[in-house]
A protein has these predicted regions:
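Bacterial extracytoplasmic/cell-wall-associated proteins, especially those involved in peptidoglycan
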Residues: 1-196
């Protein structure tokens, strides 16, 4: 099966005789041990790793992990409200496109053929989009209380992220990202300058 999300980050002692398969087993075993130590029920492993991996790809600053975990929980719970159970996470769309970083364009955000497109598919994507740290996993297991439904990283270099509970607040915060992107086209477009 797919080992995405199951390969625990860290340092491993490997013998000369160890095969790649041995190393993968060691990495997966460390993840399972970590989940057991955190008392995660086995049936929740996949969802916890998926959520934690999204958190890490969405924000590059661990001080925001808990708030992003809360946004994910609030969005998943709100199937009839403002967000209709859609996570709407750029990181999942980018993963489905085989990219890391940047911001998906409107065509990519509307593409229902991308199974990881959480702008069009409700709930969690099919699986983890990276191998999360223990800190991100802990954020999923114990998110802070809050009514946030939205967040936007307004500076892709520093990771500064703003959270909001309404679409109106989010629109105001998104304008700050737009201003940043006008000044930093290459960063916002995944290393490519837009022509024209």
């Amino acid at each position: 099966g797919n080992v995405e999300g199951w390969l625990a980050p860290g340092t491993y002692d490997v013998t000369e005789k160890a095969t790649p398969k041995d190393l993968v087993k060691q990495m997966v075993s460390r993840t399972v041990t970590q989940l057991k130590d955190l008392k995660v029920p086995k049936e929740d492993y996949h969802a916890v790793l998926t959520k934690a991996s999204i958190i890490e790809r969405e924000v590059n600053d661990s001080r925001y992990y808990g708030q992003v975990a809360r946004v994910i929980e609030n969005r998943l719970a709100q199937t009839n409200g403002e967000t209709h159970g859609l996570l709407q996470m750029d990181s999942t769309v980018q993963y489905g496109l085989g990219r890391f970083g940047g911001i998906p364009n409107s065509t990519e955000l509307a593409d229902s053929n991308n199974a990881y497109n959480t702008y069009v598919h409700q709930g969690l994507p099919p699986g983890p989009i990276g191998s999360p740290s223990e800190e991100a996993i802990k954020a999923v297991l114990n998110p802070p209380a809050g009514s946030w439904l939205y967040f936007v990283t307004v500076n892709l270099e520093t990771g500064e992220t703003l959270f909001s509970s309404t679409s109106e607040e989010q629109k105001a915060n998104t304008k700050k990202l737009d201003e940043y992107c006008k000044k930093n086209e290459e960063i916002c477009n995944g290393g490519k300058k837009k022509s024209g």
